[in-house]
């Protein structure tokens, strides 16, 4: 009987992903990767997702202060095997060392876009109109209860 596939990660996948994220962050923070593109950039690891068999780790990174973020992610992918070797010391308890894949994290950009949208005059006007309507409804309910 085949196992049911779940869309959400298991507790073990989440735990291992967090351990990998910490080890990866420490490696990047120490500046062990010798690449001018990576050395001059602060790389933030926001999330790591593990494959169900724990053999592939997809790290979502945000290169801070880099003009060409895609080039930084490409450089990280180029040095993925080196990173794998450096991280292996911190992850000795794992049976297999995961293969690293780096992807650009766009969640910060999405947050900024949504925040700008919510602060736009059109949305602010609509929100103020909803607040006024809610206050009127409360005042009407208070009158009815007297």
From Swiss-Prot:
Source taxon at top rank: Bacteria
Keyword Cytoplasm: yes
One GO CC term on file: cytosol
Localisation: Cytoplasm
InterPro entries: KH_dom-like_a/b (IPR015946), RbfA (IPR000238), RbfA_dom_sf (IPR023799), Ribosome-bd_factorA_CS (IPR020053)
PROSITE patterns linked to this entry: RBFA (PS01319)
SUPFAM superfamilies: Ribosome-binding factor A, RbfA (SSF89919)
UniProt-annotated stretches for the region Disordered: 125-146
Chief localisation class: cytoplasm
Gene Ontology MF terms: ribosomal small subunit binding
Family matches, as Pfam families: RBFA
NCBIfam families named among the record's database cross-references: PRK00521.2-5 (NF001802), rbfA (TIGR00082)
Subunit details: Monomer. Binds 30S ribosomal subunits, but not 50S ribosomal subunits or 70S ribosomes.
Family: Belongs to the RbfA family.
Function comment: One of several proteins that assist in the late maturation steps of the functional core of the 30S ribosomal subunit. Associates with free 30S ribosomal subunits (but not with 30S subunits that are part of 70S ribosomes or polysomes). Required for efficient processing of 16S rRNA. May interact with the 5'-terminal helix region of 16S rRNA.
Name of the protein described by the UniProt record: Ribosome-binding factor A
Gene giving rise to this polypeptide: rbfA
